[in-house]
Amino acid sequence: MPYRISRQAYAETYGPTTGDRVRLADTDLILEVEKDYTVYGDEVKFGGGKVIRDGMGQSQTPRTEGAVDTVITNALILDWWGIVKADVGLKDGRIVGIGKAGNPDTQQGVTIVVGPGTEAIAGEGHILTAGGIDTHIHFICPQQIETALASGVTTLMGGGTGPATGTNATTCTPGAFHIGRMLQAAEGLPVNLGFFGKGNASTPEALEEQVRAGACGLKLHEDWGTTPATIDACLSVADRMDVQVCIHTDTLNEAGFVEDTIAAIKGRTIHTFHTEGAGGGHAPDIIKICGEANVLPSSTNPTRPYTRNTLEEHLDMLMVCHHLDPKIPEDVAFAESRIRRETIAAEDILHDLGAFSIIASDSQAMGRVGEVITRTFQTAHKMKVQRGALPEDSARNDNHRLTRYIAKVTINPALAHGISSEVGSIETGKLADLVLWKPGFFGIRPELVVKGGSIVWAQMGDANASIPTPGPVHGRPMFGAFGKALAPSCLTFVSEAAMDNDIQSKLRLDRTCMAVKETRSVGKSALKLNAALPKVSVDPQTYEVFADGELLTCEPAEVLPLAQRYLLL
């Protein structure tokens, strides 16, 4: 006779199942489990008196015959493709199974074999996401890496050489020497990394040199002169060498207006940074570029979401980052031209519509490297409060909104930069870069971060305590972040030309170098759940933003979730 268990007792034991709903931290966002891949009555769970024991949920299968290295049990997966409950199997640092784990000799429906060589991570009662991807990094200091990892970000792409004046302002690693040094520095950092060369040149030779030296992309920045000539030259090199181009356009409209930039791009793929404009770009209407099919538009987190403090903090940040002098009126006017409440408010709504596709940090250069995921779900919360449910959602859940927003910090930046075959989602064959969250801390403080199949970061108590949980409990680096375990768990993204140039051997790199691929064929239509193409216009006098003729405006938030409630010091 089957044993019956209440839904509440089941959720407390094995985590939520199909039809159960979970609130995310202190937001108003609710997810609902769409499907459960585990088998009722044959669930696996580790512990005294539990299932993963010899002859029960653990088989005799050796690793060589198919048993996985690690199983994450009963996890609630949140990814762009859906919200499901499943066991997840890891082997050789990659995801090899999403389904039902256990012993096929004693259990039904097993797709992930647990053996004597299998480690267990308890995922029941936790949310599992892919590691976050931040593609707007100013590599100003190496301490950013730990801060990003502590927030659930496992891949960082951008440019810089340290706290040089150029790096403080622009995400460029200029020239072969600096690219080589940064690739060597990456050896000791427990995340995936990729570096952008400086794209500001009107002839191709110096750009090609940087790509061969290991740049995985090129960055055009107005502080180095983003003119129509440099845009055309940079994109021409990128098309030949298959790397992405990122652009921060001409705020002052010195070399042309947004229409001139669009003309210079000539329909070629380009990733536009802080597309709203407060981070830089044609004033006041760079935001309209998000309606172009070849443009991959992103935001940076200082304007995510629009709050009562957003405008006030921006001016001083901008003056510092771009080496401006508050005593020079022209510098102040330059800064003030970028900060517009109307376009920042519209940015919130364009994200909710799926017209802006990516969110990144702009680390230490107006943005905060440890707040990408937090700011993303604060924006989702604010939009639910102000705009209500999306048409695709129901009164029961916010599943479509949640999958749309998680895509902005996982799969979409991966697609934009040609690394989606390796990272960006929870799919078999991809690198096991995974983040486990307690629902009450979702988006603000990961419980566990797995990098290439090894735990690299976790909430951990006093190391001198008798058990792992006594306080002070805080995030700390784990064994996967140390020694020779680090290199095989991480990837360094470079160009195919750099691989042909044998850059890994020339620089004596231990980490696996991986070439970015198909960066020139990706268009906005390829970006998951964020491919809307509204016709956007900006009133030049009032700065009001319209999409398909409709005014986009919203009030600033007075208070946000995922904030001081979690960060009292």
Curated annotation (Swiss-Prot):
It comes from the Bacteria. Residues 131-569 form the Urease domain. Its main location: cytoplasm. Binds 2 nickel ions per subunit. Keywords: Cytoplasm, Hydrolase, Metal-binding, Nickel. The active site is at residue 322. GO terms for molecular function: nickel cation binding; urease activity. It catalyses: urea + 2 H2O + H(+) = hydrogencarbonate + 2 NH4(+). It is an enzyme of class 3 (hydrolase). Ni(2+) 1 binds at residues 136, 138, 219, 362. Its cofactor is Ni cation. The modification N6-carboxylysine is found at residue 219. HAMAP family: Urease_alpha. Heterotrimer of UreA (gamma), UreB (beta) and UreC (alpha) subunits. Three heterotrimers associate to form the active enzyme. This is Urease subunit alpha. It comes from Parasynechococcus marenigrum (strain WH8102).
